[in-house]
Amino acid sequence: MCTHSMITDTKLRKALGKKRDDIEIISDSHGLNARISQAGKISFFYRYRWAGKAVKLNVGDYPAMSITQARERRQQFRNWLTEGLDPREQVKLDKQTRQEAMSVAEAFNYWIERHCIANGLVKVDYYRQVFEKHIAEPMKNVKVDNTAKMHWINVFDSIESRVMAHYMLSLCKRAFRFCVNRSVIASNPLEGLLPSDVGQKPKKRTRRMDDDDLRKIYQWLKSHMSIESVFLVKFIMLTGCRTAEIRLSERSWFRLDDNEWVVPAGSYKTRVHIRRGLSDAAVNLVRNHLKKINTNHLVTSQRKIDGGIKDSPVHSPVASNYARSIWNGTGMAEWSLHDMRRTIATNLSELGCPPHVIEKLLGHQMVGVMAHYNLHDYIDDQKHWLRVWQSHLEEIIGEPFS
């Protein structure tokens, strides 16, 4: 039986779940209909013509879908028809898109693989580590396109460190922006949300070790910690290099007869080939260390596999803890390995080292016009001022640096 009055909520509520002798069809307008089965089940369907043939397309079930929602869906079907599209095909495509929609983890990994790894970014392991720690579990199996800003605010608010919350928002925002541009997710749920809305930037560090601090560090290294940790800290004390550069270093990076070492392009954030000088003490430090190890990497984990040391670099948090162990053990004020770079740069400046040489010693790229036209690495100047720094250190510790 078919009636042609408009569909109303009152009619449908009265008919819902009540048995009847015949199936009833209630027509609304512009092709929308409600079907009431003999068992009292109500469903919406849409009638239209395609290629000269009558078509009936399911819209949804009442009351899970309201009348308003059914009418909105009907309007979508009509719009598709106006555009020359068959609603049946569009419904299939919509369903496929929902089924293939990326989860938060899938979208993040897509960015890692298609952007970070493809472009040689070196902090990939760290990105994955912090994502697993702070985002993966609360957003487990959740589709990106199903998330809203409020969901993300709750996740970021649950991160204990406000600095890390600030960092994670920036990181995820970058990842999702890339995915939107590649059309693998529909929109960026973090668009418009500022890092300052959920956290704060890390405070600018000003820690500089004084002579007494440097003396304590050197004396502590004489009788504490593993050979890897002692080597890494001493090498940074002599060169001012980034922790990651020596942590990831391999035998082939060193040209000890020339008092040089090279950080290959792609091995750290600058992604350019960097040649650095070495003082005599640094050369001897490396030579002595190479005699003690049988791995390609100079700073490896102590974990043994099949009776041998695993030939892979120690992870960043492990290296960072080397400094913590020292200031905890000596009772010094807190400092980080990165503070050692600031200490060396400041001391060298006070000793008269030109700023451009300090920049090269630190592995920084030139800025402005010099970045484009001056590619000189001042290697002889680097070696000279590293010898000056070695002599200054030896005056502080009161003995040859070894």
Swiss-Prot record:
GO molecular function: DNA binding; hydrolase activity; transferase activity
Gene3D superfamilies linked: 1.10.150.130, Integrase, DNA-binding domain (3.30.160.390), Intergrase catalytic core (1.10.443.10)
Domain Core-binding (CB): 102-180
Biological process per Gene Ontology, one example term: symbiont entry into host cell
Enzyme Commission numbers on file: 2.7.7.-, 3.1.-.-
Active site positions: R242, K269, H338, R341, H364, Y373 (o-(3'-phospho-dna)-tyrosine intermediate)
Residue span, Tyr recombinase domain: 204-390
Keywords: DNA integration, DNA recombination, DNA-binding, Hydrolase, Transferase, Viral genome integration, Virus entry into host cell
Family matches, as InterPro entries: CB, DNA_brk_join_enz, Integrase-like_cat_sf, Integrase_catalytic, Integrase_DNA-bd_sf, Integrase_DNA_bind_dom, Integrase_recombinase_N, Phage_Integrase
Pfam families: Arm-DNA-bind_3, Phage_integrase
SUPFAM superfamilies with a match to the protein in the record: DNA breaking-rejoining enzymes
Family: Belongs to the 'phage' integrase family.
Function of the protein: Integrase is necessary for integration of the phage into the host genome by site-specific recombination. In conjunction with excisionase, integrase is also necessary for excision of the prophage from the host genome.
PANTHER family hit by this protein: PROPHAGE INTEGRASE (PTHR30629), PROPHAGE INTEGRASE INTS-RELATED (PTHR30629:SF2)
Protein name, UniProt field: Integrase
Species, as recorded: Enterobacteria phage phi80
Classification of source organism: Viruses, Duplodnaviria, Heunggongvirae, Uroviricota, Caudoviricetes
